[in-house]
Amino acid sequence: MSKQPRKQRKALYNAPAHARGKHMSATLSKDLRADIGKRSLPIRKGDKVQVLRGDFKGHEGAVLGVDYGSYKITIEEVTLSKPDGTAVFLPVDPSNVMIIDADMDDDRRIKNVTGDN
Protein backbone atom coordinates (compact mmCIF):
# COMPACT_ATOMS: atom_id res chain seq x y z
CA MET A 1 0.00 0.00 0.00
CA SER A 2 1.47 3.29 -1.07
CA LYS A 3 1.30 6.47 0.95
CA GLN A 4 1.85 8.76 -2.03
CA PRO A 5 -1.04 11.26 -2.26
CA ARG A 6 -1.35 10.82 -6.03
CA LYS A 7 -1.79 7.06 -5.68
CA GLN A 8 -4.27 7.49 -2.82
CA ARG A 9 -6.32 9.89 -4.98
CA LYS A 10 -6.14 7.52 -7.94
CA ALA A 11 -7.37 4.64 -5.76
CA LEU A 12 -10.27 6.81 -4.58
CA TYR A 13 -11.25 7.84 -8.12
CA ASN A 14 -11.00 4.28 -9.48
CA ALA A 15 -12.61 2.54 -6.49
CA PRO A 16 -15.19 -0.15 -7.28
CA ALA A 17 -18.84 0.46 -6.43
CA HIS A 18 -18.89 -1.82 -3.38
CA ALA A 19 -15.98 0.09 -1.81
CA ARG A 20 -17.35 3.58 -2.47
CA GLY A 21 -20.03 3.20 0.19
CA LYS A 22 -17.44 3.02 2.96
CA HIS A 23 -15.99 6.35 1.84
CA MET A 24 -19.45 7.92 2.10
CA SER A 25 -19.58 7.79 5.91
CA ALA A 26 -20.48 10.56 8.33
CA THR A 27 -20.12 10.92 12.08
CA LEU A 28 -23.08 10.24 14.33
CA SER A 29 -24.55 12.63 16.90
CA LYS A 30 -23.72 11.91 20.54
CA ASP A 31 -27.20 10.50 21.17
CA LEU A 32 -26.92 8.07 18.24
CA ARG A 33 -23.39 7.10 19.26
CA ALA A 34 -24.67 6.07 22.67
CA ASP A 35 -27.60 4.12 21.16
CA ILE A 36 -25.76 2.41 18.31
CA GLY A 37 -22.28 2.04 19.80
CA LYS A 38 -20.51 3.21 16.65
CA ARG A 39 -18.88 6.51 15.78
CA SER A 40 -19.90 6.73 12.11
CA LEU A 41 -22.19 5.13 9.53
CA PRO A 42 -22.37 5.19 5.74
CA ILE A 43 -24.90 7.82 4.65
CA ARG A 44 -28.17 6.68 3.09
CA LYS A 45 -31.09 8.39 1.46
CA GLY A 46 -33.58 9.30 4.17
CA ASP A 47 -31.08 9.97 6.96
CA LYS A 48 -31.53 13.30 8.73
CA VAL A 49 -28.25 15.24 8.81
CA GLN A 50 -26.85 18.53 10.07
CA VAL A 51 -24.27 20.47 8.05
CA LEU A 52 -21.12 21.18 10.09
CA ARG A 53 -18.98 23.12 7.60
CA GLY A 54 -19.45 25.69 4.85
CA ASP A 55 -21.98 28.38 4.05
CA PHE A 56 -24.88 26.16 5.12
CA LYS A 57 -23.41 25.34 8.55
CA GLY A 58 -26.18 24.56 11.03
CA HIS A 59 -28.80 23.62 8.42
CA GLU A 60 -30.65 20.36 8.99
CA GLY A 61 -32.51 18.24 6.49
CA ALA A 62 -33.11 14.80 5.07
CA VAL A 63 -30.69 13.28 2.57
CA LEU A 64 -32.41 13.28 -0.82
CA GLY A 65 -29.70 11.54 -2.81
CA VAL A 66 -26.27 9.93 -2.56
CA ASP A 67 -23.96 10.22 -5.57
CA TYR A 68 -21.29 7.54 -5.34
CA GLY A 69 -19.61 8.76 -8.53
CA SER A 70 -18.67 12.18 -7.18
CA TYR A 71 -18.73 11.23 -3.47
CA LYS A 72 -21.38 13.90 -2.74
CA ILE A 73 -24.83 13.99 -1.14
CA THR A 74 -27.81 16.30 -1.63
CA ILE A 75 -29.72 17.60 1.37
CA GLU A 76 -33.28 18.89 1.56
CA GLU A 77 -32.58 22.45 2.79
CA VAL A 78 -29.24 23.05 1.06
CA THR A 79 -30.16 24.85 -2.17
CA LEU A 80 -28.96 27.73 -4.30
CA SER A 81 -31.22 29.83 -6.49
CA LYS A 82 -30.38 30.27 -10.16
CA PRO A 83 -30.80 33.66 -11.85
CA ASP A 84 -34.17 32.55 -13.25
CA GLY A 85 -35.37 31.75 -9.71
CA THR A 86 -35.28 27.96 -9.79
CA ALA A 87 -33.68 26.17 -6.84
CA VAL A 88 -30.71 23.86 -7.35
CA PHE A 89 -29.43 21.40 -4.74
CA LEU A 90 -25.84 22.05 -3.71
CA PRO A 91 -23.76 18.85 -3.46
CA VAL A 92 -22.20 18.41 -0.02
CA ASP A 93 -19.29 16.22 1.03
CA PRO A 94 -20.35 13.55 3.56
CA SER A 95 -17.41 14.42 5.81
CA ASN A 96 -18.98 17.84 6.40
CA VAL A 97 -22.23 16.54 7.87
CA MET A 98 -23.33 14.73 11.03
CA ILE A 99 -26.11 12.15 11.09
CA ILE A 100 -28.78 13.27 13.56
CA ASP A 101 -31.38 10.58 12.86
CA ALA A 102 -30.47 7.41 10.96
CA ASP A 103 -33.14 5.79 8.78
CA MET A 104 -33.43 2.29 10.27
CA ASP A 105 -36.25 0.93 8.09
CA ASP A 106 -33.97 -1.54 6.32
CA ASP A 107 -33.34 -4.91 8.00
CA ARG A 108 -29.93 -5.23 6.35
CA ARG A 109 -28.83 -1.89 7.76
CA ILE A 110 -30.00 -2.83 11.24
CA LYS A 111 -28.02 -6.09 11.04
CA ASN A 112 -24.99 -4.18 9.77
CA VAL A 113 -25.17 -1.68 12.63
CA THR A 114 -25.87 -4.12 15.44
CA GLY A 115 -23.46 -6.78 14.18
CA ASP A 116 -26.04 -9.58 14.20
CA ASN A 117 -25.46 -12.04 11.37
UniProtKB/Swiss-Prot annotation:
GO terms for molecular function: rRNA binding; structural constituent of ribosome. Pfam families: KOW, Ribosomal_L26. Residues 1-28 are annotated as: Disordered. GO terms for biological process: translation. One of its GO terms (cellular component) is large ribosomal subunit. It comes from the Archaea. Keywords: Ribonucleoprotein, Ribosomal protein, RNA-binding, rRNA-binding. Residues 1-10 have a biased composition (Basic residues). PROSITE patterns: RIBOSOMAL_L24. Belongs to the universal ribosomal protein uL24 family. One of two assembly initiator proteins, it binds directly to the 5'-end of the 23S rRNA, where it nucleates assembly of the 50S subunit. Located at the polypeptide exit tunnel on the outside of the subunit. Part of the 50S ribosomal subunit. This is Large ribosomal subunit protein uL24. The lineage of its organism: Archaea, Methanobacteriati, Methanobacteriota, Methanomada group, Methanobacteria. The gene is rpl24.
